Amino acid sequence: VHRKGDLCTGHGCFSPRPSAQGSPNVFVNAIPIHRVTDAWNPHSCGPPTHASTQCDGSPNVFANTLKVARRGDPVCCGSKCMTHSPDVHANG
């Protein structure tokens, strides 16, 4: 599963960046779990810069009623979750 501070893949010339938000009370490896609608830090491609939110996650694993994000799940800007917990998984 993806946690606050784990990286996305980036897209086009927009580089990878860390997720900015997570659950206030659900932790994975002592780090807040990242969920659908949680924020991502801004990233840039020259002058254009944008932030984003988590678009999708597990179909049946939730934290605080929100789907948990996993490696490969889409970020709303076109990136995907990349880094993740080494030992906690949701749906394989």
Predicted features, each with a name:
Residues 1-92:
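Intrinsically disordered, low-complexity proline/glycine-rich segments
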